[in-house]
Amino acid sequence: MANKLYEVLESRILLLDGGFGTMVQQYGFTEEDYRGERFRDWNVLLKGCNDLLAVTRPGAVREIHVKYLQAGADIIETDSFNANAVSLADYGLEAYAYEISCAAAGVARSA
């Protein structure tokens, strides 16, 4: 894969996607959107944990990826900027870091 990437880079500039958080904000997700069914009774507010949307709203996350691809992005990044135990601890979700990261990768691949 790396060799193919270098080959393409020799002939043209590749475009990366843009800010994921900015796109998420445009959707106006509510606390209920972030929680989904799975985290409905979670004891901490989850709004703002954008990485969790790969689990609770994968269709919307995929749609954001598709919009970037339609706009001309050659490379998209996963929605997992804060999908690590330290950042997710703010939401009591540190034990879900691996699952959220895997979900984010799966959603990006599906786009």
Range-by-range predicted roles:
Residues 1-111:
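Domain-level signal for soluble alpha/beta catalytic cores
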